[in-house]
Amino acid sequence: MEWTLERIKRAGFIAILRGKDPTELVQRGVDLAAAGAPFIEVTLDSTDASWVFQMLRGQLDDDVLMGVGTVMHAESALPSAAEWGAQFALSPVQPEGMVDLAHDLGVLAVPGAATANELWDAHLSGAMLVKLYPAVTSWSPEMLAGIPDPMRQVNTLPTGGITADNVEQWLDAGAFACGLGSSLTIQDTDLLSSRMLERRGVLR
């Protein structure tokens, strides 16, 4: 899991797939990966999410890491996701037992937080990365930059309203990485991959 976490930090972003047309989702995942997306998340509220995930896993190179999102019930979602090959699991909330179960399965747990208290609670539960959601309505780069010093040790993944145009504002404010969904285009992915590579060179 530490290796997955480090890969996420280096990548700077996770591409999120959500939709009602499984075939289109698979093609979008293939296209995003080809454009340089190193992480693909399939949300569990997507139609035939299991099929989409496994089709993509069979088509993508091993260096593209895959995970699931919108985990609402840990016990019913995580064992199956681990069997599919999920290496990380995101939730907009903090399902009971999510962190412990995911980590027992070798899956990086990323529970959600809409407030500073929830962020700290997720950290205390053992989460190595916490999803800030919804980022643009419950958080802002200024809020993230202004959190109390003890909370700065918490790795954060702002998601919800993040775009290629504002992702670096969040990273500059202290975000570990960001999640991008329907706003992410193939061109954005190519540009983001290059920009994240440049950032690693500058920040190294």
Language-model features, listed with the residues they occupy:
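Histidine/lysine/aspartate-rich catalytic loop segments that bind and position anionic ligands
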Residues: 92-138
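Conserved N-terminal beta1-alpha1 strand-loop-helix module at the mouth
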Residues: 1-87, 104-105, 153-156, 164-165, ...
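Glycine-rich phosphate-binding active-site loops on the catalytic face of alpha/beta enzymes
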Residues: 88-98, 131-141, 173-195
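Conserved beta-strand positions in the central sheet of alpha/beta enzyme cores
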Residues: 41, 67, 90, 110, ...
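Short secondary-structure boundary segments
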Residues: 44, 70, 92-93, 113-115, ...
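Short, charged, surface-exposed secondary-structure boundary motifs
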Residues: 76-77, 98-102, 119-126, 140-143, ...
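Catalytic cores of alpha/beta
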Residues: 73-84, 117-125, 149, 156, ...
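Conserved functional loop/turn residues at catalytic and ligand-binding sites
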Residues: 36, 85, 93, 106, ...
